[in-house]
Amino acid sequence: MVIMLIFASSTGTILPSKKAKSMEKDFSIFQGNKLNLKYKRQREEVMQKKHRLIFLATVLAGLILFYFGVDTWMKQKQVQQNQPPPIVIKPVAPVKPKTQESNQTTKKEVKQEEQKKEEPKKMVQKQETQEKREVKKSEKNEVKQTQEKKDVKVAKKVPKTEKKAANLRTYKFQVGAFRYRENAYKMAKIVRSKGFDAQVVKVGSLYRVYAYVKAKNYWEAKREIKKHFKDAIFVRK
């Protein structure tokens, strides 16, 4: 038996039992590692699922919040659009009573009528003052020209035969035009006092005063009339 054991040990027949044990250990280790790997994989899968669930939950929460936020914003916008625009109240000017307006219009009409009535009066007054000035001028000329009157009187004393020989002609001059008859006749009286024949003729709305001058020619007649009436105008027959 001892020899067989020695032979078995020398040949290695006992080795298979050790290998089996070592193989069992290795197998058990391999299985343990395999189980660990499975467990790790399961844990990783669980963690991945958790992460996915968390991500999905956050996305859903964000979508829900976004939806409700947009919904509330849209509602507020619709409410603002549906609200009527603010009414602007403008200040209203105080309405004046009609009585004041009517009084003002009547006053204006009365003033206009008074102005219309006063205008012809003013025109008449201006014409009267102008006529009076002309009469005064003629009277002043009459006072200044007393010496010329004497010369005219001397000329009147010349014999008629000499005048006929000279073939004297009569020239017509206008010495004034007046609106009122009285002023015209006053002027005619002054013309006669100067030694000239005078005539008052109404032409239109004016009374014209004409003086007739006897002289040899036009220039002599003009010289004679201009001595007394500087504004005299020659009138052709």
Curated annotation (Swiss-Prot):
Gene Ontology molecular function: peptidoglycan binding
SUPFAM superfamilies, per database record: Sporulation related repeat
Top-level taxon of origin: Bacteria
This protein's name: Uncharacterized protein aq_1894
UniProt subcellular location: Membrane
The keyword Thylakoid appears for this protein: no
InterPro entries: Cell_div_SPOR-domain (IPR052521), SPOR-like_dom (IPR007730), SPOR-like_sf (IPR036680)
Any coiled-coil regions, as ranges: 98-157
Any matching Pfam family: SPOR
Keyword field contains Transmembrane: yes
Entry membrane topology: Single-pass membrane protein
Species: Aquifex aeolicus (strain VF5)
A GO CC annotation given for this chain: membrane
Keywords: Coiled coil, Membrane, Transmembrane, Transmembrane helix
Start and end residues of each SPOR domain: 165-237
Region annotation Disordered: where it falls in the sequence: 85-155
Compositionally skewed regions (Basic and acidic residues) per UniProt: 106-122, 128-155
Transmembrane segments: 53-70
